Amino acid sequence: MFKIFRTKWFRSAPVLATLWLSSTAVILIGVNSYFPDYLFMPMS
């Protein structure tokens, strides 16, 4: 079922970079929805 995770295609650099950037963007958007100005003014 999870054979795609063991293939050479999935471990290539562009795929890993896309997954990393996408997950980082999702985390930042999620945090920004709960704390709207926290990313710009963290000390306020």
UniProtKB/Swiss-Prot annotation:
It is a single-pass membrane protein. One of its GO terms (cellular component) is plasma membrane-derived thylakoid membrane. Keywords: Membrane, Photosynthesis, Photosystem I, Thylakoid, Transmembrane, Transmembrane helix. Pfam families: PSI_PsaJ (PF01701). The keyword Thylakoid applies. The chain crosses the membrane at residues 13-35. One of its GO terms (biological process) is photosynthesis. Its main location: membrane. It comes from the Bacteria. Coiled coil: none annotated. It is found in: Cellular thylakoid membrane. May help in the organization of the PsaE and PsaF subunits. HAMAP family: PSI_PsaJ (MF_00522). Belongs to the PsaJ family. This is Photosystem I reaction center subunit IX 2.
